[in-house]
Amino acid sequence: LSQKFYTIDKVKLTMAGKRIVLTADRSLMTNYRGNFLYGFIACGPYEVLPEWVFDKVFCPPVETDPITGEAKVAQVGLRRVESALLQGYKRDEIMTVNPDYIEKSIGADTKIVGINVMDPLGMAPVTTTMSPEKLSYVAMKFKKLCANIIQLKKKYDFKVVVGGNGAWELAKSDRMKVHGIDTVVVGEADELALDLFHELETGNAPELMHCYVKNIQNIPEITAPTVNSLIEAMRGCGRGCDFCDVNKRSKKDLPVERLQREAKINLDYGFDSVWLHSDEMLLYGCDNRDFQPNYDAITTLWKGLKDLGANFVGTTHMTFSAVAADPKLIKDISEINDMHKSGRWISTNLGIETVAPDMVKKHLGIKAKPFSPDEWGWVVREGAQILNKNHWFPAATIIIGWPDETPDQVQYTIDMMRDFRAFNFRGLVAPLLYQDFSEKNSMHFGNLNEAQFTLFWKCWENNLRVINDIIPIILRNKTYGPPMKIFMYGLIKAGTWAIMRYLRGLCK
């Protein structure tokens, strides 16, 4: 009987709506079946992959309360904002919700809806490369979310604020109007979130805000589980690449003790691993100008998190230069993870961008440190082999179509791809078309010259070879039953064949 009354109370609260509702589009509200690389599927064209395959096979929704729509896990960025708001609002006034259930949480009492975005209009390099002149899944899902919110806004008259890594795409008045947005926040909202939400309620909030955290102590700790057990280990990078927005942030490391507290929230929820988000994890604790990794700081962090009961500790980003600078570090964190004994491979993202020495000097800042720009090609090759030897699966990027790039410079990277094939590199290389933040000099697929298209082809030739080689590893996913394994095998085979056929057609 008590359970019945509890359910009735939840329904009543839901009908009135929460004062503040936080959400993200459906391409972000998923655990990606424990594989972050599935997130790149959202960058692909909506018309190619049936929506039920996207929603059920690759990106099933996060666990959700079916009565209230509350998401049990959410992006770490949403959790940060949620924690910041809890410094001034009551717990029962705020809810982070699954976008598929958003109408359950919005009502007459709702004052603000906050949306976290990654690539809302499909303008990021991965999306423009994978979905040239087509509607991507990530853009379609955001469009669908906004359509629902606009209808609810007409009924309940609340404010809509958007922030996150992709907020810059919406920082124009016409785009805001079309999507029903009142305020866009570009940058880091940790310190200003509470004041901003008060201003939104009183109608005094600006249309556009640019903000960055000045004091690491002002970044609030998460209080609830995050997607795929991801926690934020550090911000910024310090490498200085001229095309990267992350370079605008100063490097900040979060203390081990704090990371342990946040990791424990996810492990207590039921996750069996910890993922560290960083734009350059191997610079954690780095205290020198040579960018030599701090072995003690990194191994202490890995051990401290593994000892909480995690099966392994992964990270979203490394750099080849840090890997090549300390091969023993990679070996030892792999041993901490028991990767050799278990046979487990862990993926991580790394940027190659180009290996042409002149381009490295001009565009990649000090990405090669502690090595020289002239050594960058060797650094990438050496780093790739070190990672593979220690069971790390690189998901690397290169940039094609720099405005000042010559065919001879492209050839350096083509030669690197041939070397990858020669030593049986196990990893993906995503060729991304150059994107200018002002959109003036952005490269379009139809403008690639012969050398650039050859490089594009070599990357996908590598990717399809590797994907076919690792099908058995993909099918080990513990969320797949026997029927799903058979379906996935057929889908991967058909998908790789279709991609190669498409590329061969472009060659002709």
Feature names for model-found ranges:
Residues 2-52, 63, 67, 93, ...:
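Radical SAM enzyme core and accessory elements
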Residues 11-12, 16-21, 31-36, 70, ...:
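N-terminal [4Fe-4S]-dependent radical SAM core
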Residues 16-28, 213-247, 256, 260, ...:
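N-terminal pre-triad scaffold of radical SAM enzymes
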Residues 22, 264-393, 400-402:
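Conserved SAM/AdoMet-binding glycine-rich loop
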Residues 36-68, 120-144, 362-372, 453-466:
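A solvent-exposed, charged loop/short amphipathic helix patch at secondary-structure junctions
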Residues 77, 93-221:
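Glycine-rich beta-alpha loop elements in corrinoid/cobalamin-binding modules
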Residues 113, 121-126, 169-172, 275-289, ...:
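Flexible glycine/acidic-rich beta-alpha junction loops that bind and position SAM and/or redox cofactors
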Residues 171-179, 332, 404-419:
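Catalytic cores of alpha/beta
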